[in-house]
């Protein structure tokens, strides 16, 4: 107690003394420096002393002993936005991880949070008018996407050092491994195993003033794979994928975004105006290069920076000049936009000291993959905030670009791999990959027809040259920002398509961005061009829209004037979203692949005749001394593929709707939706009946069947035999090409709905015509094998439609299916069956129908 009192007594004295001392000196003594002064950064020298320094946009340090990489982030780089772009350099073809695949494109930023650096993705899908008060909520309800947090391992006066392995030896930026779809057996699809970071490594680290490239080999392990993949997979348990991460400075220039328009086809960035009251609050912007005139006042001027493409030294020597000439053909289109020599083509020297994978170079390369998933591809990558194209590459597969036939079966059915989901790939890049063998199939069709007709080697060479020019121009069009125009093949009539006085002026089709059928004349003496070899009217118009320079005040009116010409039939447009290549997809039959002319039905009829003519010459032409029958089998598959393409084109006119996307002020002669007229729908059905459903539709093929033998290779024969699956493949032409679309729920409902605004072909009438085409011709005779499969398939489809549990069909369709089944039952009851096979077949049909009716 005494001690306590002493403290109470002494303490005031001490305080009083301290106060007097402060008054005397006029200021308090500074506190000890060790208590409050900020510690100086320890620096990064010790952390990077065993590393190779790579200077550039971002400074990287790679440990020379273990290969690990550290990233130095300057304080001035915090909060800034950068572009990330990933590329696959080498990997499984069937997973779209092969060379030069452009994958993830995004904007990211780096911010400091205490002792860590946060990497987050920036949402570029919204726009706010800054003059609107609601713009203050721009960041509300848009969750941050922080994909990496790393603790700083060093700091100096200018920046922070972190480990970069978690950023690059990972799937943080690009989820490389595709997602396995539910419901698909794991044995059906090859996929990667789990990422093994211990076995992954850096292949190259380079950095430049405006971009840093980090190339990594990511190792995936799967100790017990269900599917061993295709021949390019050395060992399905262990797969390495080479990827390139590119960190790119946000361009700082006077580039001005250009708005998208639904009447012309550019790749675009979707942006919603969150302060708009419009019913379509879109501020979508197109992808285009930054072209500026050297002389802004000149009607035609060279650009300050042209678009330069390098033909890589992997390109076969005999094709290099053709590619250069093809690329330069785009300059005619750019002249419509006021630019001279906008595109430049150069050939990469064999001793070049630069890497074609460097994003500063736009490269056209050739590769020869083991199992190519595409014929050629021309992706580009952009600034997502503005749409400015930053770089591009074109890759051509030897399989597609060469004039050499590949001895494999080109006519193949459904592949489960197509159902994989690719979260790391931009959807627009993925769309570029969806067409695989069509181009090669068309070229081989032309070569087969020329061979069978005894054409000279020069004629075949000219066909391939035209094909290659078209192919290069098509892929280059993608790199200029253009997406597909699957409606351009409708430009010329059958009477015009082989008139070179017309085609050498405006092209064979309206745009090189279509995937048309190769042009082959039924009468060889009238043959014109096989492929279009110039920018078409649509291409020139599209480039004019995308690249014509305008001042900010003049742009809206200038673009309106250009786009107002969209009603010109030569400028018609429809992209992949509009095309009808798949059963039940879309609605305008003029937007399709593998067809040609404004009368696609008539052109298809001629192609059926050509195929039947060539069938009679296949065995003689491709029975060659010293080789097996593998080539004959391939050629037959190519011709069967032609039939499939034509069936898919003709069948779409039944229940089709012509679409006109013009705006009201254009005063188009047609309505937005116009049902295909009854006569055209009936004509399409007649062509299908004659060339696809009739008992003699495949009569010409019979002489080929006994020769369709593949070449044996080790013990790889089909376990159930090498014979060609004739009935399966022909039924696929009939069913997948026609019936799957005609009996699709979406098609049937559209037929009924369009009755309310002009369609005169009802579901009941259409099914009645199908029933007649599939049953009437042989109702009083024996039924051949083709027809047995066809009739059984048709009846089973009707049974599936009337099933009460089915939710795919509307009531009108169900009623028509039931009525058609009962008509078939009545037909069968009085049919004449003169052999046991036909009796058995018809008894089976009656059993299927009766069983279905009893269970309803």
Where are these regions (language model features)?
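Conserved structured catalytic cores and adjacent interaction surfaces
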Residues: 343
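Amphipathic alpha-helical segments that form well-ordered structural scaffolds
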Residues: 322-333, 471-475, 642, 646
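The catalytic-center signature of Zn2+-dependent metalloproteases
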Residues: 39-40, 347-367, 466-522
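Sec-exported extracytoplasmic/periplasmic mature domains
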Residues: 328-339, 477-478, 482, 518, ...
């Amino acid at each position: 107690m005494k001690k306590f009192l002493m403290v109470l007594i002494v303490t005031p004295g001490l305080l009083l003394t301290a106060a007097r001392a402060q008054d005397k000196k006029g200021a308090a003594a500074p506190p000890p420096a060790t208590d409050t002064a900020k510690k100086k950064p320890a620096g990064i020298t010790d952390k990077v002393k065993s590393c190779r320094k790579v200077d550039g946009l971002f400074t990287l340090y790679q440990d020379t002993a273990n290969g690990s990489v550290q990233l130095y982030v300057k304080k001035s780089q915090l909060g800034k936005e950068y572009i990330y772009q990933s590329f696959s350099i080498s990997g499984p073809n069937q997973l779209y991880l092969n060379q030069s695949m452009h994958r993830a494109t995004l904007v990211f930023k780096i911010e400091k949070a205490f002792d860590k650096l946060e990497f987050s993705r920036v949402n570029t899908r919204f726009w706010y008018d800054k003059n609107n008060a609601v713009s203050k909520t721009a960041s509300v309800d848009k969750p941050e996407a922080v994909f990496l947090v790393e603790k700083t391992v060093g700091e100096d006066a200018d920046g922070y050092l972190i480990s970069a392995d978690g950023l690059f030896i990972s799937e943080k930026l690009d989820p490389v491994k595709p997602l396995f779809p539910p419901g698909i057996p794991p044995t059906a699809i090859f996929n990667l195993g789990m990422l093994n970071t211990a076995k992954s490594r850096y292949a190259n680290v380079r950095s430049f003033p405006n971009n840093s490239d980090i190339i990594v080999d990511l190792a995936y392990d799967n100790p017990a794979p269900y599917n061993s993949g295709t021949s390019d997979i050395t060992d399905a348990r262990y797969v390495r994928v080479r990827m390139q991460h590119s960190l790119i400075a946000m361009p700082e220039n006077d580039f001005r975004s250009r708005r998208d328009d639904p009447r012309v086809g550019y790749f675009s960035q979707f942006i919603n105006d969150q302060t708009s009251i419009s019913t379509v609050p879109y501020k979508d912007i197109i992808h285009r290069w930054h072209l500026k005139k050297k002389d802004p006042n000149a009607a035609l001027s060279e650009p300050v920076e042209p678009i330069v493409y390098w033909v890589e030294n992997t390109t076969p020597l005999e094709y290099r000049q053709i590619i250069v000439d093809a690329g330069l053909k785009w300059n005619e289109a750019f002249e419509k936009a006021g630019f001279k020599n906008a595109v430049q083509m150069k050939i990469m020297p064999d001793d070049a000291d630069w890497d074609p994978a460097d994003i500063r170079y736009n490269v056209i390369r050739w590769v020869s993959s083991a199992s190519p998933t595409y014929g050629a591809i021309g992706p580009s990558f952009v600034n997502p905030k503005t749409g400015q194209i930053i770089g591009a590459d074109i890759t051509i597969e030897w399989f597609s670009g060469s004039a050499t036939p590949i001895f494999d079966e080109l006519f193949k059915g459904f592949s489960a791999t197509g159902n994989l989901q690719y979260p790391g790939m931009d959807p627009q890049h993925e769309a570029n990959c969806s067409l695989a063998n069509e181009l090669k199939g068309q070229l081989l069709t032309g070569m087969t027809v020329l061979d069978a007709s005894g054409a000279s080697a020069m004629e075949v060479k000219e066909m391939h040259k035209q094909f290659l020019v078209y192919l290069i121009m098509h892929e280059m069009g993608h790199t200029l920002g253009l997406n597909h125009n699957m409606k351009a093949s409708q430009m010329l009539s059958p009477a015009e398509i082989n008139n070179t006085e017309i085609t050498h002026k405006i092209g064979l089709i309206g745009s090189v961005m279509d995937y048309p059928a190769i042009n082959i004349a039924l009468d060889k003496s009238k043959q014109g061009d096989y492929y279009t070899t110039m920018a078409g009217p649509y291409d020139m118009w599209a480039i004019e829209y995308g690249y014509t320079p305008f001042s900010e005040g003049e742009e809206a009116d200038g673009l309106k004037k250009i786009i107002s010409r969209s009603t010109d039939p030569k400028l018609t447009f429809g992209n992949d979203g509009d095309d009808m290549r798949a059963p039940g997809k879309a609605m305008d039959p003029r937007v399709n692949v593998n067809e040609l002319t404004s009368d696609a039905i008539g052109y298809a009829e001629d192609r059926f005749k050509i195929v039947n003519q060539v069938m009679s010459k296949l065995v003689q032409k491709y029975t060659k001394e010293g080789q097996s029958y593998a080539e004959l089998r391939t050629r037959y598959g190519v011709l069967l593929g032609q039939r499939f393409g034509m069936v898919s084109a003709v069948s779409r006119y039944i229940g089709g709707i012509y679409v006109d996307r013009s705006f009201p002020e254009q005063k188009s002669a047609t309505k937005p939706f116009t049902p295909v007229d009854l006569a055209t729908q009936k004509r399409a059905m007649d062509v299908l009946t004659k060339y696809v459903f009739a008992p003699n539709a495949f009569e010409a093929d019979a002489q080929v069947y006994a020769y369709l033998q593949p070449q044996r290779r080790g013990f790889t024969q089909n376990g159930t035999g090498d014979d060609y699956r004739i009935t399966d493949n022909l039924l696929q032409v009939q069913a997948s090409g026609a019936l799957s679309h005609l009996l699709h729920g979406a098609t049937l409902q559209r037929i009924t709905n369009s009755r309310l605004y002009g369609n005169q072909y009802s579901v009941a009438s259409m099914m009645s015509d199908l029933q007649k085409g599939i049953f009437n011709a042989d109702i009083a005779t024996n039924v051949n094998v083709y027809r047995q499969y066809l009739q059984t398939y048709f009846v089973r489809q009707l049974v599936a439609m009337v099933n009460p549990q089915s939710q795919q069909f509307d009531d009108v369709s169900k009623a028509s299916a039931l009525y058609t089944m009962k008509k078939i039952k009545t037909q069968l009851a009085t049919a004449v069956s003169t052999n046991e096979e036909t009796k058995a077949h018809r008894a089976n049909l009656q059993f299927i129908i009766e069983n279905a009716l009893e269970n309803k």
